[in-house]
Every structure is written in C-alpha cells, then in structure tokens.
C-alpha cells in the first residue's frame, strides 16, 4: 500500500517536488506511524497517525489511531509542514504492484455558519521499540490563537532518546500554559517542552520538572509568558540519587502586582555527597534595589549588604561528620526602602550532606537588583562553589549575571564563571561566561561575551571555549551582532579544536539591504575521534521581500565538499564556502564512529520533473534530518525541501547544532543552575530586545548559542506564508501546543495560585515577561528554541494530499539522487536561490487558486473516533468492501458507504460507481456536500479510483459531531453534476443532534461570533477614543502654552508702560519710608490728604495690589493719622509682596465693600516703583509656567466636566429609552400585552389578548399565529396555537418560546385555525421588540427627499421632522441619506465637509451634486445650473415647477449613482411628485426594490399634489393619530384610507436638551430644575429688558398665521398683562399684512407696558431655546395643528404647555383636570392645560385654572418623561412640574366666568338665546332663516368644518357660538357693538 500527498493545494506551489511517504518495517511487522495534517480554513487542522502494513508482514492489521489531546488553531487555513521519517530498522523495498498505501483525503472546509478562527492540530507519538528513534514535528500558525497539544507516552530501553517540544502562541488568549515532561531510564533522556507565548495574557506560569536515575536527567518545563502579565510563576523541583542534583525554584514576578513572593527550599535525599537546593524568590513591584548575598561555608559566618536590601547568613558546621542545613526566610515590606533577609544554617550530618534554603526578593521595577550567592563545601569527594550576581534594571544601563562554580574533585574539576550584562533599553548588553577546569582528563574552559543592542548599530556575541585535553578538546567562539532595527546583524560561530593537525573553517558573509539583518555562523570542531563542522548563514530582512538562507552541515560524514559563491540581486547576499578538501576527516570520522551512532545515508526526495535532488547528505545529529537505516529516505514537508532551516523577511533562525555540540552556558550536572527572572527582555544567554529567555543545565558539555533581533527563532522562521520546522534528533518541537492531561493552567490575577506538580518532576526554567524563548534540557544535547510572537502567526503552509506515487519509482529516484550527490554542492546555492525567488510566484498562485476554486474545508476534530476498518484485517476488509460493491452493483445502486451505519464524529468511505452515474465519461470525479440540509461545514473532495473490481471511485469523509444529516452531489469539478435527479444525495447520521438542537447550536455559534465582533469593535472604539483623547490633550497643552505666552506678552507690555509712569514718591502727596526697600520688606506709606477728595473723611484706607493689579486687590490697610505740622499726613504699614516690581493702590474712606469716596489719582491710580526693581527673564518664565499650569488645570477640569456630563447624558438617554419602550408596550395593553412586559430572547412569555376591543369580539375561539424577526425568522411562520382563557376571564392567553436569535416578535389573531377573520392591527400586524437577542436586525437603506431640513433650510416643523426622524432611524443602525435642494441662502457653516460629488444632465439642464454632513447625516444637495434655487427662499414663485424638477433630479441621481434604497420617503406636497415619477419612470429600473412612503405634514397646502401622491405611494402617514382622523374624510385622503396611518411626531432629544444646551445660561436637569429655570428666566428678562420680578412669564413661539390662532394670541397678550404677568413672543408672519398688524401691536404694548412685554417679530433659533427655558408657560392656541412640536419642546425644557385640543396637541398634552384617565390608559401622566373652544373664553379658562396652583412649588427631583414631561407632580394637583421656578400666584387674573358646567344652558354664559342668534346672524348678512337645518348645513360657511363631531344640541349651540365669535375679528365685526 502506498500513500502520497498532492502538492497542488491551496498554498503549496505547483513547482514543488512531489513527496511520497513510505511505510517502515520492524521486526514485529508493524509499520511506523505516518502523520498527515488535515486543515480547514477557519477552524483548524488535525494530525492523523496511521500504522500501515508493510510487505514483510502483509497479514498485520493496519492500525489507525487518532491523537485525542491536541488542538492547533489557525485563522487562515494555513497548516504546518510535517517531517515524517521511518524507523532505523532496515526493510525491504516494496514494488508498486505489491502493496500501496490507502490514500487519505485532505478534508477541507470553509463554512459560513462557523465563525471560529481556530485551527487544531493533534499529535500523538508512541512507540514500543528498542534502539530506535522517532521524530515528529508539527507547527501551526495563527493570527489570534495557536493551540497544539501533545501526549508523549514512552517506554524506552537503553540508548533510546526521544524529545518533543510543543509551543503555543496565543496572541489574544487569557492564559499561558507551558509544560514539559522528561523521563528516561538508564542513561536515557526524554524531553518535552511546552511553550506558550501570549502577548496579552493575564498570567505567566512556568514549570519545570527534572528527575533522573543513575546519572540520567528527566525534566519537565512549563512556561507561560505574557507581555502584559500580572504575575509570573516559576516552579522547579528535581529529585536524583547518586550524584544527582535536585532543586526547586519558585518565582513570582508581577510587574504590576501588589505583592510578590519568592520562596526557596533546598533539600537532599542522597547518601553520597548529594546536594538539594531550592530557591524561592519574591519579586516586588515597587522596591528600589534588591541585594542578596549568601555565603554558606563549612565553618564560616557571612553577612553583607548591598544597596538597600540586606541579606544575612549565619552558618556553622563540622564537615567531617555533620550535615549542613540552612533555611532562609525572606520578609518584604511593600513600598519600603529596605528589605532584610536572614539565613541561619548549621551542619549536623555524618556524610557531608548540605541542605540549604534561601529566600530572595527581586524587584522587577526596581532601579537595580543584585543577586549573589556563594556556596562552598569542603567534602572529600565533591565540593562546589557558586556565585551569582544579578543586576536587573528594566530601564537602566546594566544587567549583570555572574556564575562562578568550582568543583574540587580528584577526577573531575571544573571552574565556571558567568557574567552577563543585558540592557533591554540601552545601547549595550554584555554576557560573559567563563568556565575553566583543571582536571587531568576533561578540562574545559569557556568564555562568552554577548553584546545585545536592541536599538544600537552594532552587537557582538562571542564564545570562546578552549580545552587542552589529550583525547578531546574544544575551542569555540561565537560572535553575534544583534541589530533589531539596524541595517546589519552578524552572527558568527567558530568552533575550533586542537586535537588534530587539520582544522575546518567556514565563513559566510551576507550583505543585505538597509533594513536587513546579517548573520554569520561558523562552527567547527577538530577532535581526534570525531570532527564536526557546521555553518549556517542566515539573513533576516525585517523589511524586504526576499531572503536567502544557506546552511551547510558537515558532521561525522561529510557529503558536501564545496559550494559555489552565490550573489543575489535583491537584498544582495554573498556566500563564501572555504572548506578543507581532505577526505580523510570524513572517512576517518565515519569509520571511527561506533556502529550504534553511525549516521546513515539520507536523501531528500527528488523533483520528479527534473529528476534531481536538492541535496543529499549523511545524517547529522542536530540537523533537520534524523538517523536512518541503510537505503531509507526521509521526507521533510518544507515548501522547498531545505536541508536545515529556512527563514523569512521578519524572522530568523540561527543554526542547528549537533548532539555533541548543542550546549548552553550553565552549570554542570553536579552544580546548581540559576535562572534569571526579569521584567522586560533579560535572561541568561544572548537575548533579543523583547524576546529573550534561556534555561539550561546539560551534563558536562557547555556551549553558547545566541539569538537576536526583534523576532528571531533558533529552530525555525518563516516567510509570509511558509512554515519550516526542523529540530535535532533528541530535541523536537511542535509549534503551539498544550496538553489536556497535565498542562498547568494560568489563572487570572485574583484567582491565581502556585500550581503544584509531581514530586519528582521539577526543574528550573528562566523566563521573562513579554516574549518567551525555551531551552530544552537533555543529557548531552541542548537545543535553544526561540518562538517569537510574530513568527508563530500568519505563516503556515497547507500540506495537501498528493497524488499516489509508487514506492519503486521513488526509490529509483532516491538512488539517482544519491548517485548525483557529489555534484550537488554546486547546485545547492542555486537551488536555494531559485526556491526563494519562487516564493512570490507561489503566493500569487495561491491567491489565484483561491479565486478559481472556492473549496470549503472540513477538519478532523481532535476527538475523532476510530474507523471500524482500522480494526479489521486488510484482506478481510477488502473482501467485505468487494461484496458490498457487487451487491450494490447488482441492485443498480451507484453509491454505498462503509460502514453502512453513518455515525457522527466518525470517518466513512464513500464509494461511487462511475459507470452508473452521470459522470461515466468524466476523468475526474468530485463530491460536494454539506451537513444538516446544506447548512453546516460545506466541503468539496476528490474521489480516486479504488482497488475494487468495477468502476468504483472512493474517498473518505469525516462526519462532524454536530451532523445529523449528510447532503451531497457528485460532479466533474466543473459543470457536469450527478445530483440524484435534482434531489441530491442524503444520508442520515446517527447523532445526538437533531434539527432543533442544531438550530440552538447555530444560535449559540452566532452569539459567540457576535460577542467576539462586539469585543473587537469595542476595543477598536476604545483605541480610537484613546488616540483622539491623546491628540486633544496635546492640542490643549499647546493651546495653553500659546495662551500663556500671549498673556505674558501683554503683561510685559503693560508693566513696561506702567514703569514709565511709576514714581518712588510725589512731593507733598505721598512717599515711602525707608527710601530703599525690596520685595518682602515692610515699609510705611505716607499720604497727605490735604486738598484731596478724602480731606473730610474720618477714615482712610489703602486698597492696593502690585504689578498693575496682576493679583487683584491683595493689600488692604487702614491709615493712621500722624502728627505733622507740614500737612494732613496719614500713614500705614505695608508689606511688599515677593514678586512685586510696582506697587499699585488707591485711597478710600472705608474698607472694600463699604467705601464710597476714593482718591484714585484722577483715575490713574497711584503707582510706586521699587528701587532698583528690574524684571528678569526667570521671573517671566516662572510666571508663564504658572499661567500655563492654571490654564491646563482649567482645561482638564472642563474636560472632566464634559466627560461626566456625557456619561450622565448617556445614562439619562438610556433611561428615557427604557421608559419610552415601556409606555409603548402599555399603550396597547387594552388590546394585547405580554407577561413579562419586556420580552427577552431565549425565554418563555405569555401573550394576553383582549378580543372585546377588536374585530374578534364575541368569537368563540381565537387562534394565535406568530413568528419572529419581521416574519423572516429561519423557523418561519409557526403553527397556529389556540388561546385559552385566563383566570380573570377577560383575556385569552398563549405561551410562546422566544428563540435566542429573535429581535422582534410578530403575531396576529384569527377566529379559527384555518384563518377566517383576522385581527392584524389594520394590516400592520402586532410587533413587540425582543431584547437580549444575539442577532441584529438587518439594516435598511432609507432615502429622504424633502425641501426643508433643520438647521440649514427651515421654515416650519417639516424641517425638524426630517432631521430628527433621520437621526433617530440612523441611531437604530440603519443607513439614512437625505436629498435636499442646494439653496443659495443655506448656512454652510452647519454643513461639514461640503464638496462636489458629481454632476449629471437632466432634460438639458446640468445638475451638480454636492455632499456634506448635517447633524451627522449624509446629505446630497442638488443644484440645477439654471438658477431655480438661487432666489434666496424655500417657498416663493413657481414652486410647483421648481420642486417638480428637484424630485425628478433626485430619482435620476439615485439611478445614476447606483444606489438601491429600500425606502424612498417623500414629505408633503413639495416632494409628492416623487411618488408618481417613480412609479411611471423608475419602477422597472435598478430602483425597483424601493418602496415609496409619503408623509402629510399639513393638508392645508397642495391638496391636489397630495391626492395624486396618495394614489401612487405604497404607504402614507401623517404626523399624529388625531389629525389622521380629522382629515380622513378629505377628498384627497378618503379613497386611500386603507394605507393611511397616523404616527405621532417627536423631537430630537439631543438637540433639545437643557442639560447640554449652549444657548441657555445654566444647564439643568430634574435635579436642579429650580436653579436652572431661575437662571434662564433672569437671562430672558435681561435680554428683553423686562422687569426683574418674580411673576409668571408666558412664552409664545409660532408662525403668525390664521392656523396658529392669531386672534387668540392677541387676546392672551392682553389678558396676561392685565393680570400682572409678562409675555414674550417670538415669530413672524409670511403675510405682510399680518406682520404689519403685529408691528403696530408691538409698538403699542411696548409703550403701555414697558418692562412687561416684548414682541420679537422675527425667528431666532438660539433665542427660542432661551424662551423655552425661561418661560413658565408656553401658549399654543392653534385652530388646527397636525402635530405641533412647540409643546413637546416646552415640556422638554420644563415649561407648562397651554394648548387647544386639536390634532397632535390633543395627542401629546393631557389636561391636569380632564385627561387623567386618558393619560393613565396610555401609561402617561397629566402634563399641561388644554381648552376646547376657539375663542378668547377658552384661553381665559385655561389660564384661570392656574389659581388651583396657589401656594404650590415645583417638585424637585423629577425627570422629563419621553414626551418631555416630568415624572413627579406638584402636591395635591397631579400636575407634572417641569416648569415653574417659584410659587405661581396668578392673583390678579380675574375670571369673568366660572368653569363651564356640562349641563348648563347657553343663556347662562352668554345671555343669548336662540331668537337673538336668528336675528343677529341674519343681520350679519347670513340672510338665511336660522333653523336647525341651517346649523347643520351652513356651519362650514362660518369657517368651522368639524361640527360633525358634536352630537348634542347643547354642544352644537355652545361650540357654534365659539366658532362664530371667533370669526368676528377676522371679518372685522365688532360683535360687542352689535350686541
């Protein structure tokens, strides 16, 4: 059986070599595990491991296992390459006709319903072999989250080494987990390392476990790194017997924590010179300096202090027969300046065993931290000496770490010293290690010097290891230059030995671009037995596109002798390879190597097209390839099959070291290793600027591997879409992994604790806070793995299934490749260069592939079940499949699956008989499908010809656990389909999931996605707001500085002018003694009042200041009369201010506030210059700083006040919305309501219905029909439900379950289950909003076409409605635009970013289109170039023609701009032509999806246009419910009443808000309404020159037209003035006659009632705000009013409306006496006064009722309601007070009549009778007999058209007279005279 991977995948280049995986044989007949990676675009990838039968054991059952504990996340569908290799054991070749691998599908999916950006990869490595080695590398990259988990069960014998490294990079995760488990038996080392690098984590957890038996090391490392972490946890524990070191280190590093702990426990359990040490460290965030010194010696006591941290050690012991024991406890005082540690140790043991404990305090934010430990023992068989000196300065110049170890042993002596200086923020970082030993057999000397300059121009890293041993000596030198942001970086390693006479030296210089990093690596070793040379040349180009990586590994067997130079044009790179040509080294190395360690010949798979290998080398331990048996080939899934490592433009990989040469500077096995924990970027070995950490403790051989740069990795690095993973044999890494079973979970700060680990599995690891690098520990091999944050994301290539290739063919090519190996050296650089150049082509090809093939993917989940065929003998399986195939073929079935029972979370084989399908003649067969009715995980997969007899094609499909049904079709990859006769193929899946539960699952998935999007959006907004805030702060600081400079300049000029006029004295007037004085002195000022203005005053006071009164009045002294014959002299003692240069003063006859007469030197004041007083520059600088500080403080106070106001306003707005929604729900409670009243998604509600108020009254049954989301919910219209009676018997009830994705519940009622009569709310249905939904209502596109818009073109309420309505709808999330004519009078200052967008021609006229923002609304202005809108008015001449052209231009603009609105909303007669123009000319165009909404704002004008628009529109509305009933009988409306609705207008609460209104003197809410209205009232009186008295003010804001009741307005003016009130009127008349009439009235009233009335006969928007706020009442006496906004604004500002009951006034104002019940039904409260009549008596009746308010004060603490009223009322009245600022006492309001009684006669009130009416009306030229018929027919003649509402004779008489009398002044009749 054979297995192949197809390279033509989404991101694999087509030019890549095809790779074949061959099975390995073993003695037992089982094949070695093969790994395949299956990924999907959005969720993840999976590793499937298969045991495949090989030719030598054909009967062995193929075993396929699935790893259960690994997940890999990838957001882009990338997946890592996988290196798969066979066993060491030799095996026979398998011919192509003997056996092949099963071809595994690569299941890809891209689902629209799953929004997780998560890729999962799983790895399970297990084997039970002897003397074998196995390696598996998996890397996964992800932009947000990378998770990979691994389980390493091992059962190893002697000489077996296995390792695995799992790394996890979670860019946005909350926790970091890093775990390593190393265990081995008998000189074996098993290592595992889990690394988690988390940029934004909350916790940092690091754990290491090392345990070993018989000189074996077992280690576990768990690392969590978080750049913003609050806490770092470090834990280590090790246990060993027989010369084994054991220690435990617990470290907590909290950069911002309140307290940190660090504990140390050292213990030993060994009989022969064992030492157990543990160090516990406490890191405090706020300390200044930490110093720790420990000196433990057999008979010594040491105490030392460093800086401000004290550490004392007192030890006593007898080494001959005692044991040393020492505890150390640390005490830390947060924020203190001194920390003291004391250690007292003593020895009481017989075998020289040392036990110690130390507690250490480290401060990650300290200025300097020093850690020093000195341990010394004098045991006969083993001694150790160590010293550690650490200086941790996160932002200082030095970081020093020193280790000095000395072991005095007869056979093994070692001296080591390590010194490190790391500067995370400075120009230089130095790291030194000096290890020197004088032992006779294995002396080692080493020195490491590291220079790391994260921001400098040069960095060096040097290692020099020199040995003088006869059998084995080593010299190493490493020179590293790390330039994270510079143009060149150099990395150089020189390994040179002196054992042989020949040496190998290689140098590879690389030159890059301006932004490149250059790295030179030179490794060489000369030894008598083995020689190894390695060289790696890496170029890191952080900002360029191309890069080249060249590595040559020459080890125990050197197969490549030389390479040609290579010059790359892009990012110039030079390669030089000087090598020794002697073949003796290679041959001798191979022959002298023990058999068990000999490398085997190994080749990279060849390119089949060129039949040429990239390179073929012998196995080199530590390289990318592993040890193999003879004639075995290994596949490494790199994008271009590279020998060692590739790297990309942003990431670097440095080198791979062999087993013998991979070492890290640290302590020997017998010595304790110390690990540094620091704040930013500091560790033990060569760390980059922000990504550094090293931990190591190998057994004997120590070396240094440095890494550097911003984001660099030792093991691997990537290009933009490339992942290379290669590690040494014993240290293997998997990028991004965790383990389910035994990972250590990081906790949040408040919940975190130190997590314990197994007793014998603890070791040490150093780590840092931002980016984590990991070092795995093994017996003789040490690999340094750096996993930068960016190198683990966005750079994973997908390995897809390859076409099958025969093994024999591959083996032949392998042999050809080996035979051509000698010539491969010349080709390798060229091939590597070609590989780099092909990367851009690969990316382009991948993009093209994506566009052409939208292939959705499915990934295998981590808990996938085993297929049944895995446990079946292959031959038996084949027999079963053949039987099924024959059976289905005989039955005519073209399809079957195996296993026949399809279960969720399993894998099936799908077989298709191509001959029986529509694809019989097609060469390619694909399957396309999805799950759960095509709603979940769509996929496309290719079928392959199976081995079954017949034309059976097959593939494997994974059934996800969420599936309950599989839907699919077959096709040829293009247009030919077999879809089961248009029915699709369907397979039912045995699953716990059903359709309902799947719906719930989708809802939850959607909810999670919405939460994620909301979180991202909130973070984006927060970041934008922060950037804006910082920008505003910088601007404010700059403005404050400029203002300060201006003020200083003014002061300088003023003081300069003052100095010229100042004097030291004035003869015979004033003088100062002493004559010489300075600032701070006290002097005596003399004043002669003789002949001065104060000559007769009994008291004289001095009022003074300094420097031209800069600080105001600061000196006040009373003068004392002195006895002087030369005049009337007075004096006072005056203290001169410190900053005074000129003294200023005047004299007065009293102290400030009581003085009446002054002597101010003739209005010039008195000025005395201080002697020798000269202002210096320092004074002005200080003065400028003071002014700047004051201004800045004022700015910050204003900003803080604004912030508080915005928050409060948002809260008030939210409360108002909630209250409005509640009122809306209560407003229809008499018909239907729900319990609970507010419906929440995911809950159950009861719908209660009262049919007695509907068309279903009296019906025996009522059925409830409902759905959700405007009847568009996926569940559709649900089956009708019969309603049942409630306990009260008045309502019917139905219980409804609300899904989680519902945002609106829609329902109607019917009389039967089949339908019948419906109650559908007059065709609009019932709709109740649902809160808490995880779905949002889809936005709709609305375009308003109008001729008015506030505030830029306003005539009446239409302008306000257009703006307010548009803003309100836009706030709901919809897309709103407004189209408006561009008037030449328009105030363009209110239009933001006004500019020309386009132009077009209509009927020969060019229309220019402008665009701008008005009140945050998108507005398009249409400007015809014929000047139609250049007249300076909205309504004027030829309005019909002008507005007709505008309407057609608006529709043409929408068409030509490509807009597709859902709703086109036209307003009033002026834009009514839109309705019929659209239906006649645009209904079949791109605008066909639009619907026309027409709103009538006033039927008084353009009735014929309105009637035509009513015919063509889809829906029509007017601005209030009452007005819709009043005009329903109009000829333009009546034929279309079925689509006519009344919807009440509203105001914009953001525009009309007293809390933010800048046109009123004081902002106020319900909390300070009294103070706010008092301030506004005073400002209003002052503005109009009114008397500042506490009387009621009646405000009138209106257009002066007959509709507005101008005769009632005049009457109200006179009546208010008669009762000592004040009146303010703001408005103008479009009719010049009415305007002139009011001008005469104004002149008359202003003269007669000066200071009590003011008529402002114009319109002033800012002034209207002040009138609304300062008035107590707002009068709106309209004869008719469609809606009216004035009363709404009045209530918003706390003024009581007095209105006439008509139209919208009746709908919004509820009389405090008559409308209590009506308000209660609607969930409101009474809020004003209203009257019925249209005469003066009605106005009087409303005004006089204020007498009921005598002695009442406004309620404080009330809040405006949604309508603008207040929620609390005045005592005893029920009146909601928004209004009065004081007690309202209308004591002079004399009412001529009392309140009307409903049953009273007409004669009682008007002293008129029916006879009088008949006579007088006839006299008024009615000329008709006044009969009852006349009243009914001719009442219209008297201008009242609503008499039909009057039902009783009394009402008719009463109201008739009101209407008749109202007409008298209009007709110029004096009815009093007539009477």
UniProtKB/Swiss-Prot annotation:
EC number: 2.4.1.21
GO cellular component term of the entry, any: chloroplast
SUPFAM superfamilies in alphabetical order: UDP-Glycosyltransferase/glycogen phosphorylase
Cellular compartment(s): Plastid, Chloroplast; Plastid, Amyloplast
Stretches of the chain forming a coiled coil according to its record: 1007-1065
Cited function: Involved in starch synthesis in endosperm amyloplasts. Plays an important role in the elongation of amylopectin B chains.
Name this polypeptide is given: Soluble starch synthase 3a, chloroplastic/amyloplastic
Gene: SSIIIA
């Amino acid at each position: 059986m054979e297995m192949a991977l197809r390279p033509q995948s989404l991101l694999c280049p087509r030019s890549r070599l095809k790779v074949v995986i061959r099975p390995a044989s073993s003695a037992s007949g089982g094949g070695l595990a093969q790994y395949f990676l299956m990924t999907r675009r959005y969720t993840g990838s999976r590793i499937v491991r298969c045991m495949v039968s090989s030719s030598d054991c054909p009967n062995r059952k193929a075993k396929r296992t699935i790893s259960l504990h690994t997940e890999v996340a990838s957001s882009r569908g990338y997946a890592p390459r996988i290196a798969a290799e066979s066993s060491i054991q030799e095996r026979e070749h398998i011919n192509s006709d003997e056996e092949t691998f099963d071809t595994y599908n690569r299941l890809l999916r891209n689902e629209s319903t799953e929004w997780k950006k998560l890729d999962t990869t799983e790895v399970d490595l297990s084997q039970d072999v002897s003397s074998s080695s196995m390696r598996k590398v998996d890397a996964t990259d992800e932009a947000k989250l990378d998770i990979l988990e691994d389980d390493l069960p091992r059962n190893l014998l002697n000489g077996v080494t296995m390792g695995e490294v799992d790394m996890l990079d979670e860019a946005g995760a909350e926790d970091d987990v890093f775990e390593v488990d190393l265990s081995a038996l008998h000189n074996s080392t098993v290592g595992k390392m889990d690394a988690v690098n988390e940029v934004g984590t909350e916790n940092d957890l690091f754990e290491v476990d090392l345990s070993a038996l018989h000189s074996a090391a077992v280690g576990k490392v768990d690392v969590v790194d978080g750049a913003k972490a609050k806490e770092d946890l470090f834990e280590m524990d090790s246990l060993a017997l027989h010369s084994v070191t054991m220690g435990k280190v617990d470290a907590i590093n909290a950069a911002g924590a309140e307290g940190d702990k660090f504990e140390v426990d050292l213990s030993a359990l060994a009989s022969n010179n064992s030492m157990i040490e543990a160090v516990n460290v406490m890191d405090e965030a706020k300390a200044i300096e930490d110093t720790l010194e420990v000196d433990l010696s057999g008979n010594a006591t040491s105490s030392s202090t460093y800086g401000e941290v004290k550490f004392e050690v007192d030890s006593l012991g007898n080494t001959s027969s005692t044991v040393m024991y020492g505890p150390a406890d640390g005490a830390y005082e947060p924020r203190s300046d001194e920390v003291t540690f004391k250690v007292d140790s003593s020895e009481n043991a017989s075998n020289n065993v040392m036990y110690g404990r130390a507690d250490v305090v480290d401060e990650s934010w300290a200025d300097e931290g020093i850690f020093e430990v000195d341990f010394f023992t004098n045991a006969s068989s083993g001694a150790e000496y160590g010293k550690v000196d650490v200086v941790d300065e996160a932002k200082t110049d030095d970081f020093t770490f020193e280790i000095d170890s000395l072991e005095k042993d007869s056979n093994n002596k070692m001296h080591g010293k390590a010194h490190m200086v790391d500067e995370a923020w400075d120009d230089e970082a130095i790291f030194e290690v000096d290890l020197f030993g004088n032992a006779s057999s294995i002396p080692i000397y080493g020195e490491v010097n590291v220079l790391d300059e994260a921001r400098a121009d040069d960095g060096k890293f040097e290692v020099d290891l020199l040995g003088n041993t006869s059998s084995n000596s080593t010299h190493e030198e490493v020179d590293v230059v790390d330039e994270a942001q510079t143009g060149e970086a150099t990395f150089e390693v020189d390994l040179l030995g002196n054992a042989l006479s020949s040496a190998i030296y290689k140098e590879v210089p690389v030159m890059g671009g301006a932004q490149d990093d250059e790295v030179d690596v030179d490794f060489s070793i000369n030894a008598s037995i083995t020689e190894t040379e390695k060289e790696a040349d890496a170029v890191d180009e952080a900002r360029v596109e191309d890069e080249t990586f060249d590595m040559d590994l020459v080890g125990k067997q050197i197969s490549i002798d030389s390479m040609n130079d290579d010059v790359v044009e892009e990012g110039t790179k030079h390669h030089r390879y000087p090598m020794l040509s002697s073949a003796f080294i290679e041959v001798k190395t191979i022959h002298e190597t023990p058999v068990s360690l000999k490398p085997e010949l190994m080749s990279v798979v060849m390119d089949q097209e060129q039949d040429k290998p990239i390179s073929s080398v012998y196995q080199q331990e530590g390289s990318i390839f592993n040890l193999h048996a003879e004639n075995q080939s290994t596949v490494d899934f790199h994008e271009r099959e590279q020998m060692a490592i590739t790297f990309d433009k942003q990431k670097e990989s440095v080198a791979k070291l062999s087993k013998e040469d991979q070492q890290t500077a640290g302590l020997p096995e017998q010595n304790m290793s110390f690990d540094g924990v620091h704040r930013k970027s500091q560790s033990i070995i060569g760390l980059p600027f922000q990504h550094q950490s090293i931990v190591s403790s190998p057994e004997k051989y120590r070396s240094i591997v440095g890494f550097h740069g911003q984001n660099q990795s030792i093991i691997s690095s990537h290009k933009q879409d490339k992942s290379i993973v290669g590690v040494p044999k014993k240290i293997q890494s998997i990028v991004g992994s965790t383990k389910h079973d035994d990972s250590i979970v990081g906790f949040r700060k408040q919940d975190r604790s130190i997590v314990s680990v197994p007793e014998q599995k603890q070791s040490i690891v150093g780590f840092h806070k931002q980016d984590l690098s990991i070092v795995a520990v093994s017996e003789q091999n040490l690999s340094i793995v750096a996993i930068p944050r960016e190198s683990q994301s966005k750079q994973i290539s997908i390995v897809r299934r390859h076409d099958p290739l025969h093994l024999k063919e591959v083996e032949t090519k392998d042999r050809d490749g080996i035979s051509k190996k000698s010539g491969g050296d010349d080709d390798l650089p060229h091939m590597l260069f070609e590989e780099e150049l092909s990367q851009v082509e690969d990316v382009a090809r991948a993009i093209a592939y994506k566009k052409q093939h939208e292939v959705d993917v499915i990934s295998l989940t981590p808990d996938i079940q085993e297929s049944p065929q895995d446990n079946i003998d292959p031959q038996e399986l084949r027999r079963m499949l053949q039987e099924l195939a024959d059976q289905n073929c005989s039955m005519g079935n073209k399809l079957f699956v195996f296993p026949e029972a399809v279960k969720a979370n399993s894998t099936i084989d799908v077989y298709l008989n191509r001959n029986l399908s529509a694809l019989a003649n097609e060469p390619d067969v694909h399957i396309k499908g999805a799950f759960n009715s095509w709603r979940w995980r769509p996929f496309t997969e290719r079928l392959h010809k199976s081995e079954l007899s017949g034309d059976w094609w097959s593939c494997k499909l994974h059934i996800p656990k969420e599936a309950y049904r599989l839907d699919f079709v077959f096709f040829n990859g293009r247009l030919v389909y077999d879809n089961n006769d248009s029915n699709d193929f369907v397979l039912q899946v045995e699953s716990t999931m059903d359709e309902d539960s799947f719906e719930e699952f989708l809802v939850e998935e959607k909810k999670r996605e919405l939460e994620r999007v909301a979180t991202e959006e909130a973070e984006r907004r927060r970041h934008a707001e922060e950037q804006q805030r910082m920008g505003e702060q910088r601007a404010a600081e700059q403005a404050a500085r400029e203002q300060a400079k201006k003020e200083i300049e003014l002061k300088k000029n003023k003081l300069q002018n003052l100095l010229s006029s100042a004097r030291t004295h004035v003869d015979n007037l004033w003088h100062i003694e002493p004559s010489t004085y300075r600032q701070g002195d006290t002097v005596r000022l003399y004043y002669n009042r003789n002949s001065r203005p104060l000559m007769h005053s009994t008291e004289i006071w001095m009022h003074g200041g300094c420097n031209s009164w800069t600080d105001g009045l600061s000196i006040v002294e009373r003068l004392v009369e002195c006895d002087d014959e030369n005049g009337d002299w007075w004096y006072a003692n005056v203290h001169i201010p410190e900053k005074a240069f000129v003294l200023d003063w005047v004299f007065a006859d009293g102290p400030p506030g009581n003085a009446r007469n002054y002597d101010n030197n003739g209005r010039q004041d008195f000025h005395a210059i201080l002697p020798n007083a000269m202002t210096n520059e320092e004074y002005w600088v200080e003065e400028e700083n003071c002014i700047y500080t004051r201004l800045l403080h004022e700015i910050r106070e204003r900003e803080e006040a604004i912030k508080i106001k915005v928050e409060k306003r948002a809260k008030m707005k939210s409360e108002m919305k909630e209250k409005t929604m509640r009122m809306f729900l209560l407003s229809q409670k008499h018909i239907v309501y729900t319990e609970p009243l507010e419906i929440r998604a995911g809950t159950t509600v009861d719908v209660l219905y009262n049919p007695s108020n509907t068309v279903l009254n009296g019906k025996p049954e009522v059925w409830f029909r409902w759905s959700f989301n405007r009847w568009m919910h996926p569940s559709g219209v649900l089956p009708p439900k019969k309603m049942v009676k409630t306990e009260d018997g008045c309502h019917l009830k139905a219980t409804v379950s609300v899904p989680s994705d519902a945002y609106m519940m829609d329902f109607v009622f019917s009389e039967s289950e089949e339908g019948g009569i419906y109650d559908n709310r007059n065709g609009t249905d019932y709709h109740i909003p649902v809160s808490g939904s995880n779905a949002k209502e889809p936005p709709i596109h609305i375009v308003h076409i109008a001729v008015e818009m506030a505030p830029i073109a306003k005539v009446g309420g239409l302008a306000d409605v257009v703006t307010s309505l548009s803003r309100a709808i836009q706030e709901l999330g919809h897309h709103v635009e407004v189209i408006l004519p561009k008037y030449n009078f328009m105030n363009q200052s209110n239009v933001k970013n006004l500019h020309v967008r386009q132009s077009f021609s209509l009927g020969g006229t060019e229309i220019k289109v402008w665009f701008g923002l008005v009140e945050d609304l998108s507005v398009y202005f249409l400007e015809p170039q014929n000047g139609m809108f250049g007249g300076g008015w909205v309504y004027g001449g030829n309005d019909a023609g002008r507005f007709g052209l505008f309407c057609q231009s608006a529709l043409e603009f929408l068409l030509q701009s490509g807009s597709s609105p859902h709703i086109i909303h036209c307003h009033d007669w002026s834009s009514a032509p839109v309705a019929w123009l659209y239906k006649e000319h645009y209904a079949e165009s791109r605008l066909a999806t639009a619907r026309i909404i027409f709103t009538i704002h006033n039927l008084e004008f353009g009735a014929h246009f309105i009637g035509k628009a009513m015919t063509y529109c889809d829906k029509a509305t007017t601005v209030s419910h009452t007005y819709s009933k009043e005009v329903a009988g109009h000829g333009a409306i009546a034929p279309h009443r079925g689509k006519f609705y009344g919807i009440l207008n509203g105001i914009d609460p953001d525009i009309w808000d007293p809390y933010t209104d800048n046109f009123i003197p004081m902002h106020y809410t319900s909390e300070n309404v009294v103070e706010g209205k008092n301030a506004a009232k005073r400002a209003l009186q002052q503005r109009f020159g009114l008397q500042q008295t506490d009387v009621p003010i009646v405000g009138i804001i209106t257009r002066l037209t007959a509709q507005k009741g101008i005769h009632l307005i005049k009457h109200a003016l006179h009546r208010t003035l008669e009762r000592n009130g004040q009146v303010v009127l703001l408005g103008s008349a479009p009719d010049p006659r009415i305007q002139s009439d009011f001008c005469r009235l104004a002149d008359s009233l202003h003269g007669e009632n000066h200071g009590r009335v003011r008529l402002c006969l114009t319109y002033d928007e800012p002034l209207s705000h002040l009138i609304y706020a300062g008035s107590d009442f707002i009068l709106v006496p309209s004869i008719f009013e469609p809606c009216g906004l004035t009363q709404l604004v009045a209530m918003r500002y706390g003024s009581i409306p007095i209105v006439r009951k008509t139209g919208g006034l009746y709908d919004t104002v509820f009389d405090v006496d008559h409308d209590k019940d009506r308000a209660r039904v609607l969930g409101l409260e009474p809020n004003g006064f209203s009257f019925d009549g249209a005469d003066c008596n009605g106005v009087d009746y409303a005004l006089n009722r204020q007498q009921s308010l005598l002695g009442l004060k406004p309620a404080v603490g009330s809040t405006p309601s949604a309508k603008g009223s207040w929620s609390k009322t005045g005592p005893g009245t029920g009146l909601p007070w928004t209004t009065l600022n004081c007690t309202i006492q209308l004591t002079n309001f004399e009412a001529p009549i009392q309140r009307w009684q409903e049953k009273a006669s007409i004669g009682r009130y008007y002293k008129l009778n029916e006879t009088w009416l008949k006579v007088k009306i006839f006299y008024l030229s009615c000329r008709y007999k006044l009969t009852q018929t006349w009243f009914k027919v001719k009442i219209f003649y008297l201008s009242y058209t609503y008499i039909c509402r009057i039902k009783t004779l009394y009402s008719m008489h009463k109201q008739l007279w009101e209407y008749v009398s109202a007409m008298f002044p209009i007709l110029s009749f004096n009815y009093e005279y007539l009477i």
